[in-house]
Amino acid sequence: MEHPSKMEFFQKLGYDREDVLRVLGKLGEGALVNDVLQELIRTGSRPGALEHPAAPRLVPRGSCGVPDSAQRGPGTALEEDFRTLASSLRPIVIDGSNVAMSHGNKETFSCRGIKLAVDWFRDRGHTYIKVFVPSWRKDPPRADTPIREQHVLAELERQAVLVYTPSRKVHGKRLVCYDDRYIVKVAYEQDGVIVSNDNYRDLQSENPEWKWFIEQRLLMFSFVNDRFMPPDDPLGRHGPSLSNFLSRKPKPPEPSWQHCPYGKKCTYGIKCKFYHPERPHHAQLAVADELRAKTGARPGAGAEEQRPPRAPGGSAGARAAPREPFAHSLPPARGSPDLAALRGSFSRLAFSDDLGPLGPPLPVPACSLTPRLGGPDWVSAGGRVPGPLSLPSPESQFSPGDLPPPPGLQLQPRGEHRPRDLHGDLLSPRRPPDDPWARPPRSDRFPGRSVWAEPAWGDGATGGLSVYATEDDEGDARARARIALYSVFPRDQVDRVMAAFPELSDLARLILLVQRCQSAGAPLGKP
């Protein structure tokens, strides 16, 4: 231990700087810690904490009081502290041959290396230190076994630190005992630490308990310019520190306060091993759990429970008026079709020609692309819409307000269960939202005046609609329809149908045509 560290050590124990300097000047700068403490105790110096004795304790007459700490010797408390420190450190067992050869660069048995190792552990406060060396190292050095500073061995032997393992000569040959077995056995019995760069592989195979002990209690070292340096992490970077490795009661590691690299975007929640300063006082929930807690929605709640209630009806002329039981539901105006809603509509469509309870299907008329006035192609006199609803013939002389309900349509009172219009979700948004007799988009019609465009619709909700569809609208409608069909049907079939009907942009009609194209040998015709 160097001079500044020694001074700091003794001042922590409570001694004055002058007393420590006086003792160090008497014993020398290289004096051991134990020798300095003994000299401080012998000369009568005591720590500053003990200079003011405690108040005398009252003892009943005729009884013998237990001697107080102030009534004990001047160095009793210091000895107890030193004894406690020494008892908390593990015993040290040094492989003398390995340490000496390591210091001598594996060429010379350097006894100075053993002294450096012993002094390093003494300065840390270890009291049980044993060094094992073969006894033949006491012999005079020879050319094949060079030894340097052999007097160090005798000095350590006098201090009861060095132990010679037995050896003898038989018929002129030296018989040497296995000193490694001594080292491992003593260290195992004392529950100490082995100081060596040897792995003792042969001894690990002899005893499984020794195998575990050697793996967990072997302390390696290095010499750097006559400086003994054990590693700070004897068992690797994830193992204990050197202080905990040499201590019987290792200190728990300090909690890691490393901040999470993801910060507020971390989704690990309570499973995150890093520190989150933004949530120190409440439970570290996952992001999904925090969102559920804020919105008040329980996990797994269906879409029907979170759907907002329908707004109550207003005046007859308002756009938010409640629809009639046979009114169609329309998508938002000028919006691209939603893929999820489109697939839901496909699941509700009956692609076959069977209309169920609405009546048997009628034969499809021959294909004709002749321009004409009137409604869509799938509306004819006495014909039905290819879906669950039927519309009246556009050639009727009645206005939409005077028309009776079309055949096959059963009106039900408001509020009762009714089948949902399957084609309503797929019609163009250019139709009035509240008119049950609205016409399909104008993009699939040839230019012409229709009776459906008369101003007899009542509230004038469609007064701003143009009779003729522009080319831009027609191109946008066909492009949206093509994209929607690509997501469901093969591209070649969609392209074939779109090429056969260049003027058709109604998504519902295109779906039926693609379905017919998919059937084997079915000719393309108007649905």
From Swiss-Prot:
Organs and tissues of expression: Expressed in normal human lymphocytes but defective in some leukemia/lymphoma cell lines.
GO biological process, one term: negative regulation of cell growth
Assigned keywords, A-Z: Chromosomal rearrangement, Cytoplasm, Endonuclease, Hydrolase, Magnesium, Metal-binding, Nuclease, Nucleus, Zinc, Zinc-finger
Residue ranges of the region described as Disordered: 48-75, 234-258, 296-339, 378-457
One cellular-component annotation, GO: cytoplasm
Region: Necessary for interaction with ZC3H12A, residue numbers: 259-356
Protein name: Probable ribonuclease ZC3H12D
Gene symbol of the encoding locus: ZC3H12D
